[in-house]
């Protein structure tokens, strides 16, 4: 199958996919300055990056920073580099074939395998949504005094926001997401400046150490960070939304589109690296440095920030960034859920039904755990959701790497051998870390 055939053959399938009318809806200039083409492709990478700084990251980063200082910064860096490689492969698949990852699985695997992969991916989305419900509910409580249980229920109405944005076009959706990302960036930039962490200690934290693997608690948090950073549904999402660009569906056009799409996602994920590292650095500089190694809950961190930093604004900025993170994650998770369901099952539900169904499943355990165990229970549930996400990663990564290394499917954009080897190493690292976690859990 040639590259042209690979991309054109599935057009009918893609037309009924998760993008609907948004496919090839964003124009791309064929001439002019390079920055005009870069701006045209700017967007999908930032939507994907939302998943790399959602409320689930906050819990694992806060726990890691307060308990182990700057030690786990190396894990954040590693997971971010892994994300850059995997998201680049995801964009490559979508641009080369015109299929998203879910559609490629449906085309290549037996029905039973597809149903299993779909079920696993839906569990990942629910785990992600669980983190968003908890994070947004906590932010509403911190800012407005709304009880956690009520805040969790209120999050169900976010479907209205998603529908309004989608009706205004894909660029409006991207602009909204980027605006909230800038708010998060500004909030943490100010907080880091207030905390004034020691530069040498921060830089030293990016150097990997054996303690990350030998200490079971550090490993548990490390896997949680990887699960919170490299999210399974993001691989499905990215392979779909890169197709919103109206680039020429030719070999030359696809190669150019891939270059700009990878640039977009790489820059966006470096942005996410700053946010994730900032959360951990803040916890290490403010809590760990003063002997508070027990800070694992977002509410606890919020309460301690102002008195320990001596600036009341710090806690408010923390809560505002958390709310922006929760809202942003809602938008992208809704889109990812639609893409996954339609790609695997060819089942198209109205977005509001799809969103209420997923959010309803996520709200129930939050309400029950909050009622039975209080706020401490929701904090543990938040970290657990990120470990669950990490356990499901191989089921998205392995099919992706197999597809992008298949010349018959990918044509001229087949991934080079060196890139495939790196991707398999990443897949092996994820699998080994998960097996180590299961072993330690069984022993303890």
From Swiss-Prot:
It holds the Pfam family Nramp. It is a multi-pass membrane protein. Keywords: Cell inner membrane, Cell membrane, Ion transport, Membrane, Symport, Transmembrane, Transmembrane helix, Transport. The keyword Zinc-finger does not apply. The chain crosses the membrane at residues 38-58, 68-88, 115-135, 146-166, 175-195, 218-238, 267-287, 303-323, 356-376, 381-401, 413-433. It comes from the Bacteria. One of its GO terms (molecular function) is cadmium ion transmembrane transporter activity. It is found in: Cell inner membrane. One of its GO terms (biological process) is iron ion transmembrane transport. InterPro entries: NRAMP_fam. One of its GO terms (cellular component) is plasma membrane. H(+)-stimulated, divalent metal cation uptake system. This is Divalent metal cation transporter MntH. It comes from Xanthomonas axonopodis pv. citri (strain 306). The lineage of its organism: Bacteria, Pseudomonadati, Pseudomonadota, Gammaproteobacteria, Lysobacterales.
């Amino acid at each position: 199958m040639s590259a042209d055939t690979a991309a054109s053959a599935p057009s009918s399938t893609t037309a009924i996919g998760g993008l609907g009318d948004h496919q090839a809806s964003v124009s791309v200039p064929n001439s002019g300055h390079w920055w005009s083409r870069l701006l045209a492709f700017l967007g999908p990478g930032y939507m994907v990056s939302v998943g790399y700084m959602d409320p689930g990251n906050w819990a694992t980063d806060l726990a890691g920073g307060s308990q182990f200082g700057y030690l786990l910064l190396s894990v954040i860096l590693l997971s971010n580099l892994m994300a850059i490689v995997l998201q680049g492969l995801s964009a490559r698949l979508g641009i080369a074939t015109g299929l998203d990852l879910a559609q490629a699985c449906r085309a290549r695997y037996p029905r039973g395998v597809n149903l299993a992969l779909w079920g696993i991916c839906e569990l990942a989305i629910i785990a992600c949504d669980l983190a968003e419900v908890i994070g947004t509910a906590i932010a509403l409580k911190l800012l407005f005094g709304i009880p956690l249980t009520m805040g969790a229920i209120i999050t169900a109405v976010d479907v209205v926001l998603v529908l309004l944005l989608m009706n205004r076009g894909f660029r409006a959706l991207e602009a909204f997401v980027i605006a909230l990302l800038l708010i998060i960036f500004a909030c943490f930039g100010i907080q880091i400046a207030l905390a004034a962490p020691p530069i040498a200690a921060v830089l030293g934290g990016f150097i990997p150490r054996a303690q990350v693997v030998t200490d079971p608690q550090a490993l548990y948090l490390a896997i949680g960070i990887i699960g919170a950073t490299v999210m399974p549904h993001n691989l499905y999402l990215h392979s779909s939304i890169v197709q919103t660009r109206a680039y020429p569906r030719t070999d030359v056009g696809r190669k150019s589109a891939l270059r700009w799409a990878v640039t977009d996602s790489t820059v966006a994920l470096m942005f996410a690296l700053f946010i994730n590292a900032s959360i951990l650095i803040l916890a290490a500089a403010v809590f760990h440095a003063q002997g508070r190694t027990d800070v694992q809950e977002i509410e606890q961190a919020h309460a301690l920030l102002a008195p320990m930093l001596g600036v009341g604004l710090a806690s408010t900025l923390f809560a505002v960034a958390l709310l922006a993170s929760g809202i942003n994650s809602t938008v992208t998770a809704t889109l990812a859920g639609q893409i996954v369901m339609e790609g695997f099952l060819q089942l198209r539900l109205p977005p509001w039904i799809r969103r209420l169904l997923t959010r309803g499943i996520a709200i129930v355990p939050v309400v029950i755990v909050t009622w039975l165990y209080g706020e401490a229970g929701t904090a543990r549930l938040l970290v657990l959701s990120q470990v669950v996400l990490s356990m499901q990663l191989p089921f998205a990564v392995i099919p992706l790497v197999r597809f992008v290394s298949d010349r018959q499917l990918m044509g001229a954009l087949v991934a080079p051998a060196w890139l495939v080897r790196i991707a398999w190493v990443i897949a092996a690292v994820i699998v080994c870390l998960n097996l180590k976690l299961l072993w330690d859990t069984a022993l303890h």
